[in-house]
A protein has these predicted regions:
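Hydrophobic core
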Residues: 10, 14-18
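N-terminal catalytic scaffold of extracellular/periplasmic and nuclease hydrolases
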Residues: 27-189
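C-terminal motif of bacterial Sec signal peptides marking the signal peptidase cleavage site
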Residues: 20-22
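Bacterial N-terminal signal peptides that target proteins for export
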Residues: 1-9
Length: 190
């Protein structure tokens, strides 16, 4: 199970790490880098395009494409040329239209749960261990950064276990008790 979670994390990091670079204008990056087998990475970043699917990727390709009469084409994003790509089924245990709580729980733990539930099994009372907790237990430093509030469902799925994504107090208390090394979040404008 741990190998499945680490493999899933690697694929997600690989897929989304190019999103920011692929969406920027400018010269193409020609740095191919190197990968050394057996050597552990110093840093691992997981970037989540919350709500992003093939439709949003295509919209970015169209936006960055060519709309000259007779020469219409899309512009491929950098991550679209990666040698490996992954796609995930995003329905949760109760809905074909899931929310951020259940999908982030699935990404962080490998378990599907109910919409609105963070870090708990289908019974809504059994906490399930997430990848950040596993890595912290291995002695790695953990930082969680978000453009939304840090107690939002997506970042919270990497440190909290609550039956309701609206339990902001419980989420905040678990953040403080997590022992993680760094947290930073944005705010939601209304």
């Amino acid at each position: 199970m741990r190998k499945k979670i680490i493999s899933m994390l690697f694929c997600v990091v690989l897929l989304f790490s190019g999103l920011l670079a692929g969406c920027t204008a400018g010269e193409q990056n020609t740095n191919t880098g190197t990968f050394v087998l057996g050597k552990a990475p110093k840093y691992v970043f997981m970037l989540i395009g919350d709500g992003m699917s093939a439709v949003q990727i295509n919209a970015a390709q169209v936006l960055n494409g060519n709309n000259t009469l007779g020469e219409i084409s899309t512009n491929n994003l950098l991550f679209a040329s990666f040698p490996a790509c992954g796609m995930a089924t995003t329905h949760d245990s109760t809905s074909f239209c899931p929310d951020s709580a259940s999908t982030a729980t699935a990404m962080s733990t490998g378990y599907k749960t109910h919409s609105g539930v963070i870090g708990m099994a289908v019974d809504k009372s059994t906490p399930v261990t997430n990848i950040a907790e596993l890595l912290k237990a291995e002695g790695m430093k953990i930082g969680i950064i978000s453009t939304v509030t840090i107690n939002h469902a997506t970042p919270a799925a990497y440190y909290a276990h609550v039956a309701s994504r609206s339990d902001y107090y419980g989420i905040a208390m678990q953040m403080a008790e997590s022992g993680f090394d760094f947290f930073a979040g944005g705010e939601i404008s209304k």
